[in-house]
Amino acid sequence: IEQFEDAPRSQPNLDSLRILVDVSRNGEMKHLRFQTANDHAQVFTEIDVDISENGHYNLHTIDFGAKLSRTDIEIKLSAEQASTKINGLAVTNGSQYHDTHLAVEHRVGDTQSAMTFRNMVDGKGEATFNGRVLIEKNAQRSATEQSVGNLLLSKTARVNPKPELEIYADDVTASHGCTVGSLNQNELFYLKSR
C-alpha cells in the first residue's frame, strides 16, 4: 500500500516519486496507491514495472489531491503467461489538473493486460488519460482490454481521453472503449445529496 499525503501548505511545493517493480517468475504483486497531496502541490510520479514468466501485477490507483498531478506508468510483459490488471480513478475539482499516462508492452506471446480508468471532473478541473497498449510482432496469442470512462460534473470541466492500441501480431484478442458523459441537474443534485 502506497499512500501519498502532504501537510497543508500555503506555498506551492514539488514532489517527485519513482517506483521500480520487478515481478519475478511466478510472483504476484498487488499495488494500492492513494494520492491525496495538498492543494498547492505539484506531484510527479513514475512507476516502472517488469513482469517475468507467470508473474502477475495488479495496480489500483486513486488520485484526489494536488494542484497538478502527473503519473507515468510503464509496464512490460517480458515473459509468457505474464499479466497485469490496472484500475484507476482520478477525482478532479476546482482548478486541479490530473494527467495519467499508462503504457503496457506485450513483448512476448501468451500475455494478458486489462486496464480500466475513470475520471470524475468538477469545477474548472481538467483530466487527461493516455492509455497505450503495444503488442509486438512476436507476441502472438496476447490479450488486452482497455476501458476509459469520463464523467463531467460541471460545464467548465474538461477531459482529454486517448486510448491507443498498437498491434503488430496477427493472433491477438484486443478491445478498447472510451466514453465521456455528464449528468443533468436532477442527477447531479441526487449524487451530491447522498
Language-model segments: residues:
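Conserved beta-strand/loop scaffold segments within soluble protein domains that form the structured core
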Residues: 1-189, 193-194
